[in-house]
UniProtKB/Swiss-Prot annotation:
The gene is CYP71B26. This is Cytochrome P450 71B26. Its main location: membrane. The lineage of its organism: Eukaryota, Viridiplantae, Streptophyta, Embryophyta, Tracheophyta. It comes from the Eukaryota. It comes from Arabidopsis thaliana (Mouse-ear cress). The chain crosses the membrane at residues 1-21.
Length: 500
């Protein structure tokens, strides 16, 4: 009898141990919520033209940690500030590499740039080099005279339109402004210069963005995807974009044959000097291909995003006259009757900064952060994320998360009053520039461009809707692409402010 009790007790203990082990094992390897898919294509059919919106809708059903099978690629989608914080802060080192994607690989001379390079010693040395030589605070401040000059040209042009009571296409105006600033700072050539004075340059940039934002089967379906890209014309489009950009870089190099003194150099001068000094990056010396890859980042990363933000901000202000009046009152009270706004003046404009943050919240230029590649396994919300998983953070969804933001669909800059939230990468509610090791190195330049550009537009002019148009007519639909701009161009009528 005693042996039966002992045996029963032993079986009971074994049962408890097995149950505990099972619970522990189940907690470690819980199945990540995932929508059902089809063979070969997986969940690709569930992605619409505006992928961030499609993923946002799916996350409402499957949660802030969601696994998709995009073709043959396991892809993790994070849609909340808390899960983004875990990935980009707590486990940044586990997932800070990049997948090698066909478009980026082609244009970056086989991933020689900062954006698409995998995480390795080469990337770390390149990032350090660019941070010191190209994106330091001193370097950014040194190009302020260029911003002053280009903004003055824009203000003078708008003043002429105002005197004739002509409407202004702000989408084109902001794009021309940022293009002029970037080209002059980086290449030493005005947008009106001989190399850039044509529709060809604008078309080159537009076509490149469109190509990079197009669906590439080779990124999702190994072995046969390239065949699809070849037959639908994408492969040829990639090669043409590469040839056109490469020819543009060679034109820029031709304009920099004469050396300049240190201190008067543009960014190309700096890079060519470093090449001549035989600076070592990774396992080899800095070459022309390295320089071209870096210029690709500056060209595509610096032009579009700031223009998009300024356009969305003005569209929201036009839709919200109360906010428009309030931000203009702040600017005009602070600036008084000065003829021009200086860079230092923008530091005083707290409400303008709130307007810009609110614009980034609702309209992040890059709604899905560039994909990361998981290097080593880690855990989010109890789910194990395996190595070789592709990871996306849906910044657009985070900006509309009702658990983070009250009335998330409302444009309400006051929500940032008495708030420490900013877009510098430490607050995961607002990730316009990313976070962690892969944060955008042009954060400071982009922020100052937007602040300075908008401050001048709102100081010098009142803005009215074209005749016959009402607030409800302002279309806020998004255009698909790698970056997400306003689908219809923003056209407003400037009225010169006469108190200065």
């Amino acid at each position: 009898m005693d042996s039966i009790w002992i045996l029963s007790l032993l079986f009971f203990i074994i049962f408890l141990l097995l149950a505990a082990f099972k619970r522990k094992n189940h907690g470690k390897h819980r199945r990540i919520p995932s929508p059902p898919g089809f063979p070969i294509i997986g969940n690709l059919h569930q992605l619409g033209e505006l992928q961030h919106q499609s993923l946002w809708k799916l996350s409402k059903k499957y949660g802030p940690v969601m696994l998709l099978k995009l073709g043959k690629v396991p892809t993790l989608i994070l849609s909340s500030s808390e899960t983004a914080k875990q990935a980009l802060r707590d486990y940044d080192l586990h997932c800070c590499s990049r997948p090698s994607l066909a478009g980026g690989r082609e244009l970056s001379y086989n991933n020689l740039d900062m954006s698409s390079s995998p995480y390795n010693e080469y990337w770390k040395e390149l990032r350090k080099l660019c941070s010191q030589e190209l994106f330091s605070a001193n370097k950014i401040q040194s190009i302020q005279p260029i911003k002053d000059e280009e903004v003055k040209k824009v203000i003078d042009s708008i003043a002429e339109s105002s005197s004739l009571k002509n409407p202004v296409n702000l989408s084109k105006t902001f794009l021309a402004l940022t293009t002029s600033v970037v080209c002059k700072a980086a290449f030493g050539v005005s947008f009106e210069g001989s190399v850039l004075n044509s529709d060809r340059f604008n078309k080159l940039v537009r076509d490149t963005f469109e190509m990079l934002g197009s669906f590439s089967a080779s990124d999702f379906i190994p072995y046969v995807g390239w065949i699809i890209d070849k037959f639908n014309g994408l492969q040829g489009w990639r090669k043409k974009s590469f040839r056109d950009l490469d020819a543009f870089y060679e034109q820029i190099f031709d304009l920099h044959k004469e050396e300049k003194e240190v201190g008067s150099e543009d960014l190309v001068d700096v890079l060519l000097r470093l090449e001549k000094e035989e600076i070592v990056v990774g396992n080899g010396k800095l070459t022309r291909n390295h320089i071209k890859a870096i210029l690709m980042n500056i060209l595509l990363g610096g032009i579009d995003t700031s223009a998009i933000t300024m356009t969305w901000a003005m569209a929201e202000l036009a839709k919200n006259p109360r906010v428009m009046k309030k931000v203009q009152a702040e600017i005009r009270n602070q600036i008084k009757n000065k003829e021009r706004i200086s860079f230092d003046d923008t530091d005083k404009l707290e409400y303008l900064k709130m307007v810009i943050k609110e614009t980034w919240r609702l309209h992040p230029p890059t709604p899905l952060l560039l994909p990361r590649d998981v290097i080593t396994e880690f855990e989010i919300n109890g789910y194990t994320i395996p190595a070789k998983t592709r990871l996306h953070v849906n910044v657009w969804a985070i900006g509309r998360d009702p658990d983070t933001w009250k009335d998330p669909e409302m444009f309400l800059p006051e929500r940032f009053n008495d708030s420490n939230i900013d877009a510098k990468g430490q607050n995961f509610e607002l990730l316009s520039f990313g976070s962690g090791r892969r944060i955008c190195p042009g954060l400071y330049m982009g922020t100052t461009m937007v602040e300075f550009g908008l401050a001048n537009m709102l100081y010098h002019f009142d803005w009215k809707l074209p005749e016959g148009m009402v607030v409800e007519d302002i279309d806020m639909e998004e255009a698909p692409g790698l970056t997400v701009s306003k689908k219809s161009e923003l056209v407003l009528v400037p009225v010169k402010y006469l108190d200065h």
